[in-house]
Design a protein with these regions (language model features):
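Short, small/acidic-rich helices and loops at N termini and domain boundaries
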Residues: 1-10, 42-74
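A short, contiguous, amphipathic alpha-helix enriched in charged residues
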Residues: 20-25, 190-195, 230-239
Length: 239
């Protein structure tokens, strides 16, 4: 029997009186059971920013489905709106001294802590393995694509993108002929960064001030097919 399923003695959850759902009380109970906050226009959990609310809606539905109420989809939407208010925190600053990974957290001083106890702004979908062998396939690929002196620069730039900081004020442009394999760098980065990376257009960002909103909470933006003409303005890109 489900945890909150109605029983003959009417032991109902405190947020359901048998006919109506109290959304505020539901959210209070939900937050006692689930580690989640709302900040800067997004939900965050120990897995990082919630980019798809369908699983969250599914969790809410599992708790509501025993209730004989009308229009459960609308009720779930209303609960999500109340949850934003109930779970809101005034400030959730980025942590620039650590990288959250699928199996723990790596500090920039080399210290690694296993587990995912804290709510974080971002978590990369890759595991930390201090004994991992050298990535020979990746190194051979870079050897065939770049000059030897350029490889450390690329590696350093990728490492810089792992932390939520723009203090370096740098953008990397990889220039070359078509068919050389440059796009494979973006494919590898997509695997490392997951939803923390966005495929975008530098031209669109430079021309549309609203395009920057798509980059909020994003660690890396990759333009895989940058236009050759000069940018009309660079104010939005620099900011």
């Amino acid at each position: 029997m489900a945890k909150n399923r109605k029983t003959p003695d009417m032991n109902l959850p405190m947020w359901f009186d048998g006919q109506n759902i109290n959304e505020a009380l539901f959210c209070e109970e939900f937050l006692h059971e689930r580690r989640i906050i709302f900040a800067n226009g997004a939900f965050f959990t120990p897995d990082g920013r919630v980019t798809d609310d369908l699983p969250l809606r599914g969790e809410i539905y599992d708790k509501l489905k025993f209730c004989a109420v009308n229009n459960i989809p609308r009720k779930i939407t209303n609960i999500l709106e109340v949850l934003k208010l109930e779970a809101q925190v005034p400030d959730f600053p980025p942590e620039q001294d650590r990288i959250h990974l699928s199996n723990g957290t790596l500090l920039l001083d080399g210290t690694f802590t296993k587990g995912r106890p804290a709510i974080v702004r971002s978590r990369l979908p890759v595991a930390y393995n201090p004994n991992a062998p050298a990535p020979e396939i990746w190194q051979n690929f870079l050897d065939g694509l770049l000059h030897a002196e350029d490889i450390p620069t690329l590696q350093e730039f990728i490492g810089y993108c792992l932390i939520p900081s723009n203090k370096g004020q740098r953008m990397m442009v990889i220039k070359g002929n078509g068919g050389e394999g440059k796009s494979q760098i973006g494919a590898v980065l997509s695997t490392i960064f997951g939803t923390n990376m966005k495929d975008g257009s530098i031209g669109k960002i430079s021309e549309n001030r609203f395009a920057r909103a798509d980059l909020e909470h994003i660690l890396l933006c990759v333009d895989d097919d940058m236009r050759m003409e000069a940018l009309r303005q660079t104010n939005y890109v620099k900011s």
